């Protein structure tokens, strides 16, 4: 089983492909500044992905894995600040889904 006990999967919908690609470029420039903070707070993994199975939708998915609820809570202030900055730069709709890991099978 994974070390992660709590997972958050968020999606961000952008108005255009250009806005989405610009966000990805900006994240590449910003992530070295931001990622050490949640890592120190107990975040185990952060993954960015392009959702490809929704035609006409410009959506990114973000997977956050935390070692426990305390780590998740510590990191929320950090991610809220990042999200606030992202929304100030361009319009985006963010939807979050949180879950507790019940079963985790690895095949690698």
PLM region descriptions:
Residues 10, 27, 34-38, 64, ...:
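Generic low-polarity alpha-helical segments
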Residues 1-4, 39-61, 84-108:
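Glycine-rich beta-strand-turn "strand-cap" elements at beta-sheet edges
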Residues 5-14, 45-80:
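Short, well-ordered beta-strand segments in beta-rich or mixed alpha/beta enzyme
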Residues 13, 19, 29, 68, ...:
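Acidic-enriched, low-complexity/disordered segments with a strong bias for Aspartate over Glutamate
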Residues 18-46, 80-88:
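Short amphipathic alpha-helical segments
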């Amino acid at each position: 089983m994974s070390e992660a006990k709590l997972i958050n999967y968020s999606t961000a919908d952008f108005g255009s492909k250009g806005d989405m690609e610009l966000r990805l470029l900006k994240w590449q420039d910003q992530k070295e500044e931001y990622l050490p903070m949640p890592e120190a707070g107990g975040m185990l993994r952060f993954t960015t992905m392009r959702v490809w199975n929704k035609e006409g939708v410009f959506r990114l998915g973000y997977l956050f894995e935390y070692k426990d609820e305390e780590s998740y809570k510590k990191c929320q202030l950090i991610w809220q600040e990042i999200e606030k900055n992202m929304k100030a730069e361009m319009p985006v709709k963010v939807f979050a889904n949180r879950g507790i890991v019940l079963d985790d099978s690895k095949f690698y």
